[in-house]
C-alpha cells in the first residue's frame, strides 16, 4: 500500500468532500494484497466514511489465480461482504457470494468409491470455499483433503452438483478407483497397470511434479496406456495427491 501513488488514504481523503456520506466507489487493487493489507484498506475507508457497506470482489478467469481484486464501497456494495466472479471462455459469468468462513482440513483414509474434486484456489483466497461446498455437496458427507497450493481438493461421498455455479469453480472431479504410493518413472508400470485394471483408458497427471519432468512423464504414461490396446469405452482418468499417496480417478 505504501508503494501506491498517490497514497490511498490521501487520495480518498481528497475526494471525500465531493462525495456523499453514502458514496458509490469501486477501488481496483492489486490481486496480491494479503489479508492484513486488505484490513488496512478497510480501515482507511472506515476512517473517512464510517461503517459504510463494503464488498470485496475477487475475479478469476479460471487459471488458478486471482486476476482482479476490488473493493466495492457504499451504493456499489453487495448485500454480502465477499463475492467471487468467474469469467468463462464463452463469456458466461458465475457469481458466488457470502461471508468469509474458515475451512479446515480433515484427515482420514482415502476410500475407493468416493469422489475427489480439485477446485479453483480462488475459492480459498476469497474465503468462500464453505459457501461453495454447501452448494456442491448437498447430499452425503464431504471434507476438505487439501486447502493450500494450486489444487485444493474436496472428498465427498456423492458426486458434486452439476450446476454451473458449482462446476465453474471446479478444475476436475472424479470417482476414486484405486490408490498408489508413488508417481514416477520408476513406478510407471505399477501406475498404468492399476489404471488399466480400474477401467481407465487415459490418465492425466494432476499432481505436483517438476515442470521439466512432467511432460516427459505424461508422454511415457500415454505410451504405456496405449499398449493395453483400444478401449471401446473411452474412460478418461487422472491421478492426483491424496493423503500420503496418490489417487487414480475416473473423470466425471
What are the language-model segments listed below?
Residues 1-252:
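SAM-dependent transferase fold signal centered on methyltransferase-like domains
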Amino acid at each position: 500500500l505504501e508503494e501506491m501513488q498517490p497514497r490511498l488514504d490521501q487520495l480518498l481523503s481528497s475526494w471525500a468532500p465531493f462525495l456523499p456520506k453514502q458514496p458509490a466507489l469501486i477501488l481496483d487493487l492489486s490481486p496480491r494484497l494479503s489479508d492484513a493489507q486488505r484490513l488496512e484498506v478497510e480501515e482507511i475507508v472506515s476512517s473517512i466514511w464510517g461503517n459504510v457497506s463494503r464488498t470485496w470482489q475477487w475475479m478469476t478467469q479460471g487459471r488458478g489465480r486471482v486476476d482482479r481484486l476490488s473493493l466495492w464501497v457504499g451504493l456499489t456494495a453487495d448485500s454480502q461482504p465477499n463475492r467471487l466472479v468467474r469469467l468463462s471462455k464463452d463469456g458466461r459469468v458465475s457469481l458466488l457470494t457470502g461471508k468469509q468462513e474458515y475451512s479446515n482440513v480433515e484427515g482420514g483414509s482415502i476410500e475407493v468409491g468416493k469422489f475427489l474434486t480439485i477446485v479453483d484456489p480462488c475459492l480459498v483466497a476469497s474465503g468462500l470455499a464453505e459457501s461453495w461446498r454447501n452448494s456442491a455437496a448437498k447430499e452425503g458427507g464431504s471434507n476438505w483433503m487439501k486447502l493450500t497450493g494450486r489444487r485444493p481438493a474436496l472428498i465427498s461421498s456423492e458426486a458434486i452438483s452439476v450446476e454451473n455455479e458449482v462446476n465453474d469453480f471446479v478444475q476436475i472431479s472424479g470417482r476414486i478407483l484405486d490408490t498408489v504410493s508413488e508417481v514416477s518413472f520408476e513406478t510407471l508400470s505399477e501406475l498404468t497397470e492399476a489404471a488399466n485394471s480400474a477401467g481407465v483408458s487415459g490418465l492425466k497427471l494432476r499432481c505436483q511434479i517438476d515442470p521439466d519432468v512432467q511432460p516427459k512423464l505424461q508422454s511415457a504414461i500415454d505410451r504405456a496406456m496405449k499398449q493395453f490396446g483400444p478401449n471401446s469405452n473411452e474412460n478418461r482418468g487422472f491421478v492426483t495427491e491424496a493423503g500420503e499417496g496418490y489417487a487414480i480417478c475416473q473423470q466425471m
